[in-house]
Design a protein with these regions (language model features):
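Small beta-barrel nucleic-acid-binding modules, primarily SNase/OB-fold domains
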Residues: 2-11, 33-267
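Positively charged N-terminal leader segments that act as targeting/secretion signals
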Residues: 10-26
Length: 267
């Protein structure tokens, strides 16, 4: 009887080791960029040479044209006496090592130009979408802006490994809504403290500190949100006091406008 129990324990122990090894292997496979579908190489673009890298998401071509990468926002390099955001130099160096002096393939967006006159385009190097590779390593956040969303599903999926592993920008994100104290890009998390309907959409206050503006065209996708829910949002924070002398009653100083459905998620 004792020997039978020992054999059973040995078999059970071996089975547990095999199961444990399986889950450990599956976990690391999940974190591997190779486990995620590669963004497709789309037709309709052109070849060009990159001669300068400004930062992690902007380059200059030999023609002189500046290009802003679609689908990603990387930390800002400090200018005019302001410090670099964490990870800014790392993202810039990564991009420079791969594309400076190289022939690349550029696929312009449906919206081809931003307000600074930069060409908006997907940038491929050796048939790989650069934004996808950067997101996989936590060098920036995925974005869906305007009509330039053809590869949004793929790019938002690409940031998952870095997020799970808390790599790069995900070491400090999401930020608590209560911590917002300056303009600029942010990925925040907070609890809904108030929802107010406006003429063109909804204002959603998080922790009585940060207001999100949700356009009416996106409101239907988030109709079930209610006070007390925890949500996550990403986008550019504005300081209302830079545009107006004082705040109206109940108005939050910090405002983040939701520009795409993917930028607002239940948490």
């Amino acid at each position: 009887m004792a020997s039978s129990l020992n054999r059973l324990r040995q078999r059970t122990s071996k089975k547990a080791l095999h199961v444990g090894a399986f889950f450990v292997s599956a976990f690391w496979l999940l974190l591997s960029p190779a486990a995620w579908a590669q963004c497709p190489l789309l037709p309709g673009g052109f070849d060009a040479e990159v001669v300068h890298v400004y930062d992690g998401d902007t380059v200059r071509l030999k023609s002189g044209q500046r290009v802003r990468l679609i689908g990603i926002d990387t930390p800002e390099i400090g200018r005019d006496g302001r410090p670099d955001q964490p990870g800014a130099r790392e993202a810039g160096r990564w991009l420079e090592r791969r594309v400076k002096g190289q022939q690349v393939y550029l696929l312009p967006g449906v919206e081809r130009q931003d307000r600074y006159g930069r060409l908006l385009a997907h940038l491929y190097w050796r048939d790989e979408l650069i934004a996808e590779k950067m997101l996989q390593q936590g060098l920036g956040f995925a974005l869906a802006v305007g009509a330039n969303t053809r590869l949004a599903d793929c790019l938002f999926s690409a940031e998952t490994p870095a997020r799970i592993a808390s790599e790069g920008v995900w070491r400090r994100a999401p930020r608590a809504a209560m911590e917002i104290d300056k303009p600029g890009f942010a990925l925040v998390r907070g609890r809904i403290s108030r929802i107010t309907q406006a003429r063109a959409g909804y204002y959603i206050d998080l922790d009585d500190h940060l207001a999100l503006f949700l356009p009416e065209k996106l409101g239907a996708d988030h109709a079930r949100m209610q006070v007390g829910d925890r949500i996550e949002a990403r986008g550019w924070v504005q300081d209302r006091l830079q545009r107006q002398n004082r705040l109206s009653h109940g108005q939050q100083r910090w405002l983040l406008r939701i520009t795409a459905d993917r930028h607002l998620q239940a948490n």
